[in-house]
C-alpha cells in the first residue's frame, strides 16, 4: 500500500500562530521554514508563546531555517513602487519558490498559474513571479541544504489513460466482471462513509443491467444480496468497518451455502462507529476471522485507486469460479484518491466461468 502518511516533512510557518497550530503535524527531524520577520513580540504574545521558539531550544527536535522573507522579497522588487502590505502578501510565493528548489520542481506550472490568476493585474503577476524566483534562487545560493530531493517523472505504459478515483474504479471493475460472466449485477447497500458513493455510482449504470437497492440497514443489505446470488445474479454489497461487524452472520451463511457474493469493505478509522472521514487499514483480522465457526473467505486488498479496478474484477472472478464469498479491502484514502488509470483492452481480460444451475437435479 502506498501512502504519504499523516506527518509532514516540511512545515512553512509564516508566523508564530501557524507554527503553534501545525507543529504537531510535523515529523521529528522535519524541516521548519519560518519568516522571522513575523515573529514579533506582539505576534508571539497573541499566539501564546512565552519565548521566541526560533531563538530558544524548544524546536531542537526539528531542523529550523529562519529567514527574513519580507526583506528578501523587498530586495527582489525594490525597483517597483509597491506597498509594504503587498510585499508582505507575496512572501508566500517566496516560500513556495524555496520549497520548489528543495524538491527539484520546475517553476513553469506555478508561473503559468500566477499569470492566469492575476491576468487583469500585471503588477501582481510581476511581484509574485519575482518573489517565487527569489525563493528558488535563495535555495540555490545558501548552504543550508546539503542536497535536494528529486522526484522523478512517472513512467507510463503506452495506452489510453483517464483519471479515476478508487470507488469509481471498483464500480468499473464490477461492471466489467459482470459483462465477462454474462450476469446481471445486484448491488444492495446501506449508506456509510466512505462507501456510500459506490451505490450512487452503480445506480447510474442501469444500461449495463445493474440493479441497485438501498436497504434499511446493513443486515438487510447483505441478506438481499444472498437472495439475489441464489437466484443467479452477481451479488455485491459495500460497507465500512461498523457495517462489516453487522454483516458477519450473513456472510457466514454465504460461506455455508457456497454462494459467490462480493463484499467491499471501504475501511475508516476507529473502533465501534469509527470516524467517517478518517482513513485506516485495521480491518484485516476482522475480515479474516470475524465470524463464528469455520467460515473462511477470500480477502483481496487494493494498493492504489487504479488497482481497485483489477482487484474488483479479480474478486468477482474468484467468487464466481470457486463459489465462495470474497471480501475486497479498500480504505478512505484509496476510495477518494485519484490517479491516471490505463484503460484495459476488453479482450485482454479473461472470460469468467460461472456455475449456474440451469435445470433440475436428477
Segments (PLM) and residue ranges:
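Active-site cofactor/cluster-binding pocket
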Residues: 1-181
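Thiamine diphosphate
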Residues: 1-27, 172, 177, 185, ...
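Short beta-strand segments
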Residues: 13-15, 33-35, 65-68, 239, ...
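Acidic, Ser/Thr-rich peripheral helices and adjacent loops at domain boundaries
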Residues: 42-59, 280-288, 345-361
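Glycine-rich, charge-decorated loop segments at or immediately adjacent to ligand/cofactor-binding or catalytic sites
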Residues: 42-48, 76, 248, 271-278, ...
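Conserved thiamine diphosphate
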Residues: 59-72, 278-327, 331, 354-358
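A glycine-rich phosphate-binding loop feature that marks nucleotide/adenosyl-phosphate handling sites
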Residues: 114, 131, 152-156, 191-194, ...
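Conformationally flexible catalytic loops at phosphate/diphosphate-handling active centers
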Residues: 140-151, 155, 326-362
